[in-house]
């Protein structure tokens, strides 16, 4: 339909794969490429299995690598890369603007517009966003999609965190360190766990947690 497209990627490697498989066939319709920082952007993020969710990487080398990949495909530097994730003040990005290594750069705000008078979200939520401190945002994998997602820690998310911490590995037969039979909450079933996990499971069960909410 001759509609311009703006792919969202989190690495030069991801763009290369998409470019070779599809985008190169309609290169004239490529309006821009959005680089979504997999550690700083909100919502679902494109963190790969090779990347550590607890060790954020500097976005500059990653965006530079993305531009180099675009150049390999013959895409001119006038095609913008849109930096998304962690953008609040443009003054924080002065060394990115008019930088020949990066080519044309634009910036995408996500959180700031939510705080405007025109924003339809509840005032209570706006006030909450204004009081967020370090550690209040969690990069988690609780989404049913299986992808990492970044969200503000609310009571529901905290309950999922606590539940996730009460997970133990088990075996359906004795193997390795899994030689202690789980004896709480699994009536009629045989599971073997490590001694440490058995003690933890007993403690959780004694605190009122069941197999369904351990």
Task: List each model region and its residues.
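Conserved active-site-proximal phosphate/metal-binding subdomains
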Residues: 30, 38-59, 69-78, 90-214
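Conserved alpha/beta-domain cores
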Residues: 1-54, 65
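Glycine-rich beta-to-alpha transition loops that act as phosphate-gripper elements at the mouths
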Residues: 7-15, 77-92
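Generic beta-sheet signal
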Residues: 8, 36, 84, 109-110
């Amino acid at each position: 339909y001759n509609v311009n497209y703006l792919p969202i990627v989190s690495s030069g490697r991801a763009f290369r794969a998409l470019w070779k498989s599809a985008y190169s066939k309609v290169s004239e319709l490529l309006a821009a490429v959005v680089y979504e920082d997999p550690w700083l952007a909100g919502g679902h993020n494109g963190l790969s299995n090779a990347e550590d969710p607890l060790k954020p990487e500097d976005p500059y080398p990653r965006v530079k690598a993305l531009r180099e990949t675009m150049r390999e495909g013959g895409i001119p530097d006038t095609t913008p890369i849109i930096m998304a994730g962690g953008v609040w003040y443009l003054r924080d990005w002065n060394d990115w603007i008019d930088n020949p290594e990066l080519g044309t750069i634009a910036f995408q705000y996500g959180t700031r517009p939510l705080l405007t008078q025109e924003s339809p979200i509840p005032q209570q939520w706006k006030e909450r966003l204004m009081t967020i401190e370090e550690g209040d945002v969690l990069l988690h994998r609780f989404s049913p999609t299986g992808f990492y997602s970044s969200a503000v820690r609310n009571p529901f998310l905290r309950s999922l965190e606590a539940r996730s911490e009460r997970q133990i590995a088990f075996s359906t037969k004795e193997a390795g360190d899994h030689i202690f039979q789980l004896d709480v909450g699994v009536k009629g079933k045989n599971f073997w766990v490590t001694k440490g996990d058995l003690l933890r499971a007993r403690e959780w069960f004694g605190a009122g947690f069941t197999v369904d909410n351990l």
